[in-house]
Amino acid sequence: MLCRSDKAMRQVPHKTASIELPNDKFLKEVRTLIAAGHDVTLRVRGVSMRPFLEDRRDQIVLTQPGVVKVGDAVLAEIAPGKYVYHRIISIEGDKVTLRGDGNVYGTEQCRLEDVAAATKELIRKGRSYSAQGKAWRYYSALWPSWSFARRVLLKLYRMLKLYK
């Protein structure tokens, strides 16, 4: 994962070194930086946000969560020291339900206070998208919440990836 505060990111040229640390320790520090008012850039790890964010290729810029809503992709602590970057699919009172774009059925839950960061920007295939911009909102709205369609589209996506 790549982590730099917003100020450091602007000063660093395109080529940056990256280091890998255990998520429980690393993301605790990320959460501290965000709570202090910094934006943090992370390289995506894992496939749970496919097809929109790819493992080790894409990056996310995280910021303080503010008011989150259904459809937002957030970094949340779902158990002590266990963090996920997934999309909010429902909010009922203080209970937030999350699901990765690449997950067909599985969901996670946390409390509103456990949402550590919101997405400010996404860097996909080297191109920057605002999380509040039309392109990302369009992607988010098009991605079906219906399990069967999600399963079929993810299967097609995986098959196409094999033939590249």
Which residues fall in each region the model found?
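Extended hydrophobic leader/signal-anchor segments used for secretion and membrane insertion
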Residues: 1-164
